[in-house]
UniProtKB/Swiss-Prot annotation:
Upper taxonomic lineage: Bacteria, Pseudomonadati, Pseudomonadota, Betaproteobacteria, Rhodocyclales
Role according to the record: ATP-dependent carboxylate-amine ligase which exhibits weak glutamate--cysteine ligase activity.
Designated name of the protein: Putative glutamate--cysteine ligase 2
EC annotation from Swiss-Prot or TrEMBL: 6.3.2.2
GO molecular function: ATP binding; glutamate-cysteine ligase activity
Pfam families documented for this protein: GCS2 (PF04107)
One of the GO BP terms on file: modified amino acid biosynthetic process
Species of the source: Azoarcus sp. (strain BH72)
Class in the EC hierarchy, top level: ligase
Length: 375
C-alpha cells in the first residue's frame, strides 16, 4: 500500500486529543466503564469527539480544528463538563495523569473493536500494558515538506515537552523514580521512537513504500513515533506528552507547541540534519527520568545545560510568537512552573504521604479534573 497524499490544512491550526482514566469511586482502581460512557454521550451536541481506546477503562476526548489557545480551552472544558455529568450518573471518576498509580495491567480488558483486538493479538500483553494515558497535539501544515520540516524541528523540543507534561511517577503501586514512566510503555513497541530523517515527501514516501513492502506496516497508524505526519489531516502530530491533570494545563501545553511551530515555520531557524538525532534518545531519557533537572544536550553544538535552562531559553525564543497567537498568559504560567520546579509529577508526589494512600491520590486527581481546577 502506498502512502496517501498529504492533504494541506490551515497553517498553525491546532487540535488536541486527551486519553483519560475511568475509575471506580469505591476504590479508585480503573473500571471498565468506557462502553457506558460512550452509550450515554452518543447523540450529545459536543464541541469535539469522544472515542474508545485500547482497554475499556480508558476514553479519549478530542477537540475540533481550533485557531488558538482560547478555542482549545473552551472546547476541552466543554467536553470535560459533558463527561463529568455522565460519569457522576454512573458513579465513575475521571482523571488525568499519564499512568494509573496502582492498577494491575493483567486485569484490563481490550475494548471490543477490530483494530484493538488485532493489536492485542499482535503485541500480546503489551497491548494491556498500554493502558497509559497521553496527550496528542496536531498542528496544521500548508504542505507535506513543511510538515517534515516541522517534524524534525520539533524533535529538538521533545525533552521540553516531556518535562512540562510529566504526570506518571507511579506505576503498579510503586514510585518509579521517573517523572514520566508512561513513555517506557510506549518504547516497548517496535515501531516507536523517532521518525526517519527525510525532508521531502517523495523521500518519506519512498521510506514508507519500503516498509510497506516488508509487510510490517500498512498505514501511518502502525508507527508509534513521538512525532509523526498525519497526511489525511494535513497535520504534524506530537505524541510524547503525558495527559495533564487539568484541561487548563493541556491547553497551555498545546499553546506552547503552537508557538514553537510558528517560530519554526516563520523564522526557519534551523537546517535539520540526521546528526541532530545523535543525542535524541539520551535527551528523551533524561527528561523522562529527571524532568526539569535532567541534562539537555544541544543537537547542534553539543553544549550541555539543564532541561529547565533549555525551557527558559525556548520561552524567550517564542515570546513574540506567543503574543501573536494570544497565548502569552498560558505560556507564562508554564514558564512560572518551570522556574519553581512544578509539574504534575511534582504535585502527585506531593499528595502521597504516611497517612495518604495511592487510592487517595487518585481520588485527588479526580477532584482536580472533575471540578475543573486550574493549572
Amino acid at each position: 500500500m502506498s502512502l496517501e497524499a498529504f492533504s494541506p490544512s490551515r497553517a498553525l491550526s491546532i487540535g488536541v486529543e486527551l486519553e483519560l482514566q475511568l475509575v471506580g469511586t469505591h476504590d479508585y482502581d480503573l473500571v471498565g466503564a468506557a462502553d457506558d460512557m460512550l452509550r450515554l454521550t452518543a447523540g450529545l451536541d459536543l464541541p469535539g469527539d469522544i472515542k474508545p481506546e485500547m482497554t475499556d477503562s480508558m476514553i479519549e476526548i478530542s477537540t475540533g480544528v481550533c485557531d488558538n489557545h482560547a478555542m482549545v480551552l473552551t472546547q476541552l472544558d466543554g467536553l470535560r463538563a459533558a463527561l463529568v455529568d455522565i460519569a457522576r450518573r454512573l458513579n465513575v471518576g475521571i482523571c488525568g495523569g499519564g499512568t494509573h498509580g496502582f492498577q494491575d495491567w493483567g486485569e484490563r480488558r481490550i475494548f471490543d473493536n477490530p483494530r484493538f483486538h488485532y493489536l492485542h493479538e499482535l503485541y500480546g500483553y503489551l497491548a494491556k500494558q498500554f493502558t497509559v494515558f497521553g496527550q496528542h497535539v496536531h498542528i496544521g501544515c500548508p504542505g507535506p515538506d513543511a510538515a517534515l520540516y516541522l517534524v524534525h524541528g520539533l524533535s529538538r523540543y521533545i525533552p521540553h515537552l516531556i518535562a512540562l507534561s510529566a504526570s506518571s511517577p507511579f506505576l503498579q503501586g510503586q514510585d518509579t523514580g521517573f517523572q514520566s514512566s508512561r513513555l517506557n510503555a510506549v518504547f516497548a513497541f517496535p515501531l516507536s521512537g523517532r521518525a526517519p530523517f527525510a525532508l521531502s515527501w517523495s523521500d518519506f514516501g519512498a521510506y514508507f513504500d519500503k516498509m510497506s513492502a516488508t509487510g510490517v506496516v500498512s498505514s501511518m497508524k502502525d508507527f508509534y513515533w513521538d512525532i509523526r505526519p498525519k497526511p489525511e489531516y494535513g497535520t504534524v502530530e506530537v505524541r510524547v506528552m503525558d495527559t495533564p491533570l487539568t484541561v487548563e494545563r493541556a491547553a497551555a501545553l498545546a499553546a506552547y507547541i503552537q508557538a514553537l511551530a510558528r517560530y519554526l515555520m516563520v523564522e526557519r531557524p534551523i537546517q535539520p540534519r540526521e546528526d541532530d538525532y545523535l543525542v535524541y534518545t539520551f535527551n528523551r531519557f533524561q527528561a523522562c527520568r529527571f524532568g526539569y533537572a535532567g541534562t539537555y544536550v544541544d543537537p547542534e553544538n553539543h553544549t550541555h545545560c539543564s532541561i529547565a535552562e533549555a525551557l527558559e531559553a525556548s520561552f524567550t525564543r517564542i515570546e513574540q510568537h506567543a503574543i501573536e497567537l494570544g497565548a502569552e498568559a498560558a505560556i507564562g504560567r508554564l514558564r512560572a512552573d518551570v522556574a519553581s520546579g512544578r509539574n504534575d509529577a511534582w504535585w502527585l508526589r506531593g499528595q502521597l504521604g504516611p497517612q495518604v494512600t495511592l487510592p487517595e491520590v487518585v481520588m485527588a486527581q479526580c477532584r482536580r479534573w472533575m471540578n475543573g481546577e486550574g493549572m
